[in-house]
């Protein structure tokens, strides 16, 4: 049996565990706003991942928008190294879910299984993805205990409100730096067979163009800053005339 076949078999054997883990995560109502039960779900994940041999670290985003003693912004990062520290594959999922809303036919926090699907607030976005990451990592380690590299799994806060108390807070402190992480997989709900390059990062900048004021009757005596900005925008647009490779 090939390695791929062994992995597929191991994952299939954990199907019930995957469903159960998804249900247990759904049962922790991490609604955002306001940011309920972040500590509870991080502690749950800490128990699960440490039991699988991961070293875990819980990080509160002190001072981040929304963080307070009533609603602390907690995150968890778990790491397991094989024979070496690199390459490191990091699985990131957010722990928060949006408000419940109306029109439910089942308890939104029960994780009801019906017609082969798990129903509940966050089942798709993205506690199912988090559970899949954990079960996949555990299955891989069971088949390849002496793998080369490292696996990280994170549960981060506040994705539904900008991520300032979650991914952004951790990124500013080097948790996703190239020195630590080589690849990131984010199991957001797209399509079960769709894997895509979804995020290249962001570069924030302030660009200022300058001109010279003149009377509207004699614009040729001035220098229009807006026109210069238009030229800048035209050059920026040229960067996106074709898809990136």
PLM regions and their residue ranges:
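Acidic/His- and Gly-rich active-site-bordering loop/insert found
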Residues: 2-118, 142-148
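A short, acidic/glycine-rich surface segment
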Residues: 64-65, 98-100, 192-196, 216
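Beta-strand secondary-structure signal
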Residues: 75-77, 152, 204-208
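Alpha-helical metal-binding/catalytic segments enriched in His/Glu/Asp
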Residues: 91, 118-160, 209, 220-237
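Acidic/histidine-rich catalytic neighborhood of metal-dependent amide-processing enzymes
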Residues: 126-200
């Amino acid at each position: 049996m090939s390695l791929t076949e062994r992995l597929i078999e191991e994952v299939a054997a954990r199907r019930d565990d995957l469903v159960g883990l998804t249900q247990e995560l759904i049962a922790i109502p991490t609604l955002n706003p306001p940011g309920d039960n972040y500590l509870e779900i991080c502690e749950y994940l800490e128990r699960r991942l440490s039991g699988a041999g991961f070293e875990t670290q819980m990080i509160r985003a002190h001072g981040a928008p929304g963080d307070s003693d009533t609603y602390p912004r907690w995150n968890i990062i778990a790491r397991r190294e094989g024979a070496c520290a690199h390459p490191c594959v990091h699985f990131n999922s957010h722990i928060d879910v949006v408000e419940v809303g109306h029109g439910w036919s089942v308890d939104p926090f029960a994780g009801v299984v019906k017609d082969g699907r798990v129903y509940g607030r966050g089942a798709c976005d993205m506690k199912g993805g988090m559970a899949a990451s954990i079960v996949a990592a555990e299955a891989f380690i069971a088949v390849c205990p002496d793998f080369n590299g490292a696996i990280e799994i994170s549960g981060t806060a506040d994705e539904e409100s900008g991520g300032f108390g979650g991914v952004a807070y951790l990124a500013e402190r080097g948790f996703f730096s190239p020195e630590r992480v080589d690849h990131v997989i984010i199991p957001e709900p797209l399509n079960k067979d769709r894997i895509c390059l979804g995020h290249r990062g962001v570069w924030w900048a302030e660009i200022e163009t300058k001109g010279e004021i003149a009377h509207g009757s004699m614009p040729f005596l001035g220098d229009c800053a807006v026109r210069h900005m238009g030229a800048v925008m035209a050059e920026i647009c040229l960067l996106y005339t074709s898809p990136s490779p």
